Swiss-Prot record:
Reactions this protein catalyses: a plastoquinone + NADH + (n+1) H(+)(in) = a plastoquinol + NAD(+) + n H(+)(out); a plastoquinone + NADPH + (n+1) H(+)(in) = a plastoquinol + NADP(+) + n H(+)(out)
Assembly information from the UniProt record: NDH is composed of at least 16 different subunits, 5 of which are encoded in the nucleus.
Gene: ndhE
PANTHER family for this protein: NADH-UBIQUINONE OXIDOREDUCTASE CHAIN 4L, NADH-UBIQUINONE OXIDOREDUCTASE SUBUNIT ND4L
Name of the protein in its database record: NAD(P)H-quinone oxidoreductase subunit 4L, organellar chromatophore
Lineage, highest ranks first: Eukaryota, Sar, Rhizaria, Cercozoa, Imbricatea
Main location: plastid
Residue ranges of the TM segments: 3-23, 32-52, 63-83
GO cellular component, one term: organellar chromatophore thylakoid membrane
Alphabetical GO biological process terms: ATP synthesis coupled electron transport
Pfam families: Oxidored_q2 (PF00420)
Xref: HAMAP family: NDH1_NuoK
UniProt subcellular location: Plastid, Organellar chromatophore thylakoid membrane
Family: Belongs to the complex I subunit 4L family.
E.C. designation(s): 7.1.1.-
Length: 103
C-alpha cells in the first residue's frame, strides 16, 4: 500500500496553514516560534514527498530537508535565546509589549 503524493501535499498544506494561523493570531512569542517551526516542518514534508515521487533514486530532497532542519534548529536556538533575554528584562513574552526603542 502506497500513499499518493496528494496526501502528503494535503498534509503539508494543512500544517502550513495551521502555522500561518498561529503566526498571525498569537501574541505569545513562544507560540510564534512554534508556528514558524511548524511551517518549516511542512516545507520538509513537501521536499521529502517531491523527492520520493519525482526522482526516487536521487537524494536531493533529503539533502534540502536536512538543510532546512539545520536552519530551523539554529533559528529556534537564536529565537529562544532572544526571548529569554527579553523575558529577563521585561518579565513578559507578550509580543505587543515588546518595544525595543523604549526601555
Amino acid at each position: 500500500m502506497t500513499i499518493m503524493l496528494e496526501a502528503y501535499l494535503t498534509l503539508a498544506a494543512v500544517l502550513f496553514c495551521i502555522g500561518v494561523w498561529g503566526l498571525i493570531n498569537s501574541r505569545n512569542a513562544v507560540r510564534v516560534l512554534m508556528s514558524i517551526e511548524l511551517m518549516l516542518n511542512a516545507v520538509n514534508i513537501n521536499l521529502m514527498a517531491f523527492s520520493n515521487y519525482l526522482d526516487g533514486e536521487l537524494i536531493r530532497g533529503q539533502v534540502f530537508a536536512i538543510f532546512v532542519i539545520t536552519v530551523a534548529a539554529a533559528e529556534a536556538a537564536v529565537g529562544l535565546a532572544i526571548l529569554l533575554s527579553l523575558y529577563r528584562n521585561r518579565q513578559t513574552v507578550d509580543m505587543e509589549r515588546f518595544n525595543l526603542l523604549r526601555w
